[in-house]
Regions:
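N-terminal, polar/charged subdomain of small-to-medium soluble alpha/beta proteins
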Residues: 1-113
Length: 113
């Protein structure tokens, strides 16, 4: 049972993109500045439900917009901290008028391998 307060209200849809992988120049250590590394993100975007059911891609918040927000931030250049990347990505998503809230997390699967 999902006790997510945003969902309990009945006002929002939760759009999830899990385990999205990209390459990013990210990390505070010197060796992390040399090459891009794998970055895995989990993003949930809460969008307000409309008053009528929809069945057209043009009428909903498309997953592609989540990927686009991530990739724009990644392409801006080296980022020292995952928290910075997450904040910038969340800010981009929250700039969309239909987005009420964002949950976002990341991992660098190869950082300690």
């Amino acid at each position: 049972m999902d006790l997510d307060p945003m969902l309990i209200s009945g006002k929002y849809w939760k759009i999830k993109l899990n385990r999205y992988e990209t390459k990013a120049r990210i990390g505070a250590y010197q060796h992390e500045r040399l090459l891009p590394q794998r970055l895995r993100l989990n993003v949930s975007v809460y969008v307000e439900k409309g008053s009528a059911p929809v069945n057209e891609l043009s009428e909903v918040f498309n997953y592609d917009r989540i990927i686009e927000a991530i990739e724009v931030v990644v392409q801006e250049g080296h980022i020292d901290l995952q928290e910075t990347l997450l904040e910038r990505t969340a800010e981009r998503l929250l700039a969309c008028p239909e987005v009420a809230a964002v949950q976002i997390g990341s991992e660098k699967p190869d950082a300690y391998s």
